[in-house]
Amino acid sequence: MSVIISKDNFKIIQYDNHIFTIEFASPCPALIHSLVNTKLILGATTTNDYQTVKFKAHTVKTLLQYQGEKTSPSIKTAHLLTSQLVTQLQYLLHENSTILGYHPENIIVINDQTFAFLGAEYVTHIYDEQIFISYPFSHADFFVSPELLKIKDLPSYVHYKTAYFSLACLVVYTLLGNHDFYDKYLQTHSSALDIMQNLDHHTIKHTKVYWLLSRSFIAEPEKRTILFI
């Protein structure tokens, strides 16, 4: 048995016979259901206390590790990641929950083909299409939406579709292989349109992923959608 990934709110342990467990620091039923009930992690089972998920796999790594191993960004990777994370997010939305923000360190990659969000500390409940922000966060914690950047006082509320913008940033990171676009966005407060311009000469243009990004990179959060068709 060995701990192969250790974060503040979860760790992944590898056992013999290709058995892995995800152990969360505290119960997170909504997030665990989004992994198991959607069959995102095939064959996964969970404990009654909603703190541990058990499954079989050959490899498990973070998205940051996965990207570091690749020689160049892949459209196929971006397509898989987008499809699977949208499925997970839509399940959470159905449960009246959402995700505050995404980061390559809170995404795991199973067998180089399954992508799952594990950042339990960023799963939050939706109240009348708003989410409650009660604690400070760093711009380095996750990809931050424009409305989160504007928060001056705590506690505060933002629209639940803040998650769509953050997910779109994660997809662009996967496509470009770096987060230079995000650093520029933070430094210059550039618009979502400016982020999309990073893809003007990319072969992703006019694909399903591209159109999802264009629907997610909208300044007014209530107008964003995550249709992946």
Can you annotate each of these PLM segments?
Residues M1-N48:
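ATP-binding glycine-rich loop module of kinase domains
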Residues T203-A219:
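Conserved C-terminal C-lobe helix
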Residues H103-F143:
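Activation segment/activation loop of eukaryotic-type protein kinase catalytic domains
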Residues V86-T98:
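Protein kinase catalytic-loop region centered on the HRD/HxD motif
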Residues F217-F228:
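A conserved short helix/loop substructure at the end of the activation segment
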Residues S166-N178:
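Short, conserved alpha-helix in the C-lobe of eukaryotic-like protein kinase catalytic domains
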Residues L81-T82:
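Activation segment signature within eukaryotic-like protein kinase domains
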Residues F24, V36-K76:
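Conserved structural core of kinase catalytic domains
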